[in-house]
C-alpha cells in the first residue's frame, strides 16, 4: 500500500515538502487546517481499506486533524506526522523531523496510540500549559488519577501525552531549580479559581474554573 493513492499529504502553512513526500497527492491548507479541507479528503481516503493521511505541519496542525477525526468518528485513518522542526509532539511520539519523519510516515506501520483530549473535546498532541489569568501564578489543586500533583500556588501546570499507556503525564513549574517530577495516569484534573489553558501553542483567552485532560476511549493510529 505504501505510496499508493490511499496516502495523501496535508501541507499546512506552506511547510517545505520533503523529498519522500514529493510524489504523493497533496492538499494545501492553513497553519490550523480548515475542517472543510479535511472533509474533502475523507471520501478519497475512504475509498481504500487502509487510508493514510500525512500531516506536514506543527503540533497544532496535527491536533486539529485528530480533533476532527475524533469528533467525526474516523480514527481508523492512519496518521503520519511530519514536523519541519522538533516539537513537543515529535518528542512525545518519537517521529523525527523533516525527511526522516517523512520516510517513516510513508513506509512505517500504524501503531495504536493513546489519544489525549480535554474536557472541551480538543485533542492534545504536544503540550498544554496552564497558568493563572494574565500569566499569573496558578492557584488550585490538581490530581493525576488519585495522586495529588499540587495544592496551592505554582507558576504553571504542564500536561503532555505519552506514546504508551497510561497516556497522560503532568508536572508543575516552580521557581525552584530541581528536576521536574512527572506523574503519569489516565487523566490529569485541575480545580482552580481561574486558569488559562494554552494547548499546543494556541492560547484560549477564557478563564476556566477547571480543566481536565484524559485518555479517549478510542486510540489513534500513528504511523511509526
Question: Model regions: which residues?
Answer:
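Catalytic core of DAGKc-family lipid kinases
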Residues: 3-22, 29-49, 56-201
Amino acid at each position: 500500500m505504501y505510496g499508493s493513492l490511499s496516502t495523501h499529504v496535508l501541507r499546512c502553512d506552506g511547510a517545505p515538502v520533503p523529498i519522500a513526500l514529493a510524489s504523493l497527492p497533496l492538499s494545501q491548507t492553513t497553519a490550523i487546517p480548515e475542517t472543510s479541507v479535511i472533509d474533502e479528503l475523507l471520501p478519497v481516503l475512504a475509498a481504500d481499506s487502509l487510508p493514510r493521511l500525512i500531516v506536514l505541519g506543527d503540533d497544532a496542525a496535527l491536533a486539529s486533524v485528530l480533533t476532527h477525526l475524533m469528533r467525526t468518528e474516523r480514527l481508523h485513518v492512519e496518521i503520519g506526522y511530519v514536523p519541519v522542526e522538533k516539537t513537543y509532539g515529535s518528542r512525545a511520539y518519537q517521529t523525527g523531523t523533516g525527511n526522516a519523519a517523512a520516510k517513516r510516515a510513508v513506509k512505517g506501520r500504524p501503531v495504536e496510540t493513546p489519544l489525549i483530549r480535554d474536557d472541551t473535546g480538543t485533542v492534545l498532541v504536544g503540550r498544554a500549559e496552564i497558568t493563572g489569568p494574565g500569566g499569573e501564578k496558578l492557584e488550585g489543586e490538581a490530581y493525576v488519577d488519585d495522586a495529588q500533583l499540587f495544592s496551592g500556588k505554582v507558576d504553571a501546570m504542564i500536561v503532555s501525552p505519552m506514546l504508551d499507556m497510561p497516556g497522560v503525564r503532568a508536572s508543575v513549574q516552580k521557581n525552584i531549580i530541581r528536576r521536574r517530577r512527572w506523574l503519569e495516569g489516565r487523566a490529569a484534573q485541575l480545580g482552580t479559581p481561574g486558569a488559562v489553558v494554552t494547548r499546543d501553542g494556541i492560547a484560549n483567552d477564557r478563564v476556566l474554573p477547571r480543566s481536565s485532560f484524559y485518555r479517549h476511549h478510542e486510540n489513534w493510529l500513528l504511523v511509526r
